[in-house]
Swiss-Prot record:
GO biological process: L-arginine biosynthetic process; protein complex oligomerization; regulation of arginine biosynthetic process
Subcellular location field: Cytoplasm
Source organism phylogeny: Bacteria, Pseudomonadati, Pseudomonadota, Gammaproteobacteria, Pasteurellales
Gene Ontology cellular-component terms listed: cytoplasm
Family matches, as NCBIfam families: argR_whole, PRK05066.1
Predominant subcellular localization, coarse grouping: cytoplasm
Keywords, comma-separated and alphabetical: Amino-acid biosynthesis, Arginine biosynthesis, Cytoplasm, DNA-binding, Repressor, Transcription, Transcription regulation
A GO term for molecular function: DNA binding
Name by which UniProt lists this protein: Arginine repressor
Biological source species: Histophilus somni (strain 2336) (Haemophilus somnus)
Amino acid sequence: MINEKADSLVNAFKELLSQESFGSQSEIVSALQQMGFTHVNQSKVSRMLTKFGAVRTRNTRMEMVYCLPNELSVPNTGSPLKNLVLDVDHNETLIVIKTSPGAAQLIARLLDSVGKSEGILGTIAGDDTIFVTPTTGNDIQILITNIQKLFESSL
């Protein structure tokens, strides 16, 4: 009986962290208590965060939230691109691509390999953001469409 309660607490805890919307331990405590785990307190949540290796990172809305390491999976060349690219935005002269953490350099390398023939002058990549500079004279909207098609294809 105790193991079943502990297992259900662990499952609820992991489910909450997968939502990537809890920025503080007290928010996690409140959510668990609302789910019926009334005995949970901040120190218990702190121990669980440590036990499962949870970290605080930015979600897609740029909020600092707790998440589990398996949700921060490191991208590799086998990862579908559409799962790694979160957003593509632009102004008149520059394209900004937001990716999952750690994926920007992988995707920038792909874009660089496509190169000038497709209208890409160059890229600069950080951990989760890529700046794409189009070649002179190219319609930026056409380039964005081509980039989005590239992400949709299963490479």
